[in-house]
Regions:
Chain B
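N-terminal alpha-helical segment
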Residues: 11, 49-51, 79
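Sequence/structural segment immediately N-terminal to covalent heme-attachment motifs in c-type
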Residues: 26-47, 61, 111-114
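Stable alpha-helical elements in mature extracytoplasmic
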Residues: 27, 35, 62, 69, ...
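C-terminal capping alpha-helices of c-type cytochrome domains
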Residues: 75-78, 86-113
């Protein structure tokens, strides 16, 4: 019993390590903005705390730093294919490749509050 | 009967307090209850650990963005089979209460330039 659970945890560890190795490239890319990580289109709204979108309606643009990479990817792809509508986001997303979407999403996932702090509304 | 002006004033002030304070407290309680009942199962008990990574973290998100999202899900302007169903029965007050509760929670979400 003990032995098999040890084996299992060994196998799990090996799996974790190999997927970590695969993620290395994404992690490295996430560190810096550039042609592969075209966040220059994002920062004008999403890197200004409290920034309000004024069209089509007035509300603060969502915080995306610290959001999960997979959610940001899903959101950008939904805008790109028209499943989700917002004039500027649709325009931005239509200009991005799958690879750029992944890179931008990883970039923002890595830019949350750390450690987690209480936030004001 | 024995009540002078002073007593009447104190009585009125007491009524005002009883009415005003619990209204806000009740809204917060309602928001918390709604969030636990309607959101936690998928978005996580802390609203940061969703059961599916493509679902967003909600804790600490801006209140007005959460409200807009829920309104858009309610009207169908934003489409998601699950969220459209969840948002449909919510009133404007429900949407405000739940968004206010979620926005005040601690979390990693940030729009700081880093």
């Amino acid at each position: 019993m003990k032995h098999s659970s040890l084996l299992l945890s060994g196998a799990l560890l090996a799996m974790t390590q190999s997927s970590a190795a695969q993620d290395n490239k994404t992690a490295a890319v996430a560190a810096t903005a550039g042609p592969d990580v075209p966040v220059s289109m994002c920062i004008g709204c999403h890197s200004i705390p409290g920034y309000q979108a004024s069209f089509p309606s007035v509300y603060r643009v969502p915080k995306i730093g610290g959001q999960s990479q997979q959610y940001i990817e899903a959101a950008l792809k939904a805008y790109r294919q028209g499943a989700r509508n917002h004039p500027s986001m649709t325009a931005v997303a239509r200009g991005l490749t799958d690879q750029q979407i992944s890179a931008v999403a990883a970039y923002y996932e890595a830019r949350g509050n750390s450690p987690v702090v209480a936030v004001s509304k | 009967m024995s009540g002078g002006i002073k007593t009447k004033f104190a009585w009125a002030a007491g009524v005002a307090l009883v009415v005003a304070v619990p209204a806000a407290a009740q809204d917060a309680k309602k928001g918390e209850a709604l969030a636990q009942q309607q959101c936690a199962a998928c978005h996580g008990k802390d609203f940061l650990t969703p059961i599916d990574a493509t679902y967003p973290k909600l804790a600490g998100q801006y209140q007005d963005y959460l409200e807009k999202s829920l309104r858009d899900y309610k009207t169908g302007a934003r489409k998601n089979a699950i969220m459209n169903g969840i948002a449909k029965p919510l009133t404007r007050g429900d949407i405000r209460d739940v968004s206010s509760y979620l926005a005040a929670l601690p979390g990693p979400l940030s729009n700081e330039k880093r």
